[in-house]
Amino acid sequence: ISQYITKAQGFFNQAIYWTKVTVEVSKQIYIREGLAPPSVAEIQQVYQGLYKKALEFAAQPKTSADGLIKVAKSLSKEEYLRFGAYFIQIVGLFSLGEIIGRRQIVGYPSFGPKEHHH
């Protein structure tokens, strides 16, 4: 039993450490990017805009797709790098959540009876 307690304490200490690291990195990103929580009016404005854009896209998908391509071509190298970094962060956090949820890096645990292959 003491072996399991020692192992659990190790996992707990690692979880605390990485939580603190994540909080500190998040604070630095929050400050450096000048982030702030949105106001209710900003949230409403964004969702109303998204709704209008979705309706426009549904009505004229070809025109909307051409506009999207035009915007993509107008982005600078710095913007592509910044958005690429955001994408990598999102994928990394999603993957971390998947790993935590599965409790292993690859595949899903099987809780049923084990099959024997001959």
Curated annotation (Swiss-Prot):
Protein name as it appears in the record: ATP synthase subunit g, mitochondrial
Gene of this entry: ATP20
Domain of life: Eukaryota
Main location: mitochondrion
GO biological process, one term: proton motive force-driven ATP synthesis
Subunit description: F-type ATP synthases have 2 components, the catalytic core F(1) and the membrane-embedded component F(0), linked together by a central stalk and a peripheral stalk. The central stalk, also called rotor shaft, is often seen as part of F(1). The peripheral stalk is seen as part of F(0). F(0) contains the membrane channel next to the rotor. F-type ATP synthases form dimers but each monomer functions independently in ATP generation.
Cited function: Mitochondrial membrane ATP synthase (F(1)F(0) ATP synthase or Complex V) produces ATP from ADP in the presence of a proton gradient across the membrane which is generated by electron transport complexes of the respiratory chain. F-type ATP synthases consist of two structural domains, F(1) - containing the extramembraneous catalytic core, and F(0) - containing the membrane proton channel, linked together by a central stalk and a peripheral stalk.
Compartments reported by the entry: Mitochondrion inner membrane
Keywords from the named record: ATP synthesis, CF(0), Hydrogen ion transport, Ion transport, Membrane, Mitochondrion, Mitochondrion inner membrane, Transport
Alphabetized Pfam families for the sequence: ATP-synt_G
Cellular component GO terms, alphabetical: mitochondrial inner membrane; proton-transporting ATP synthase complex
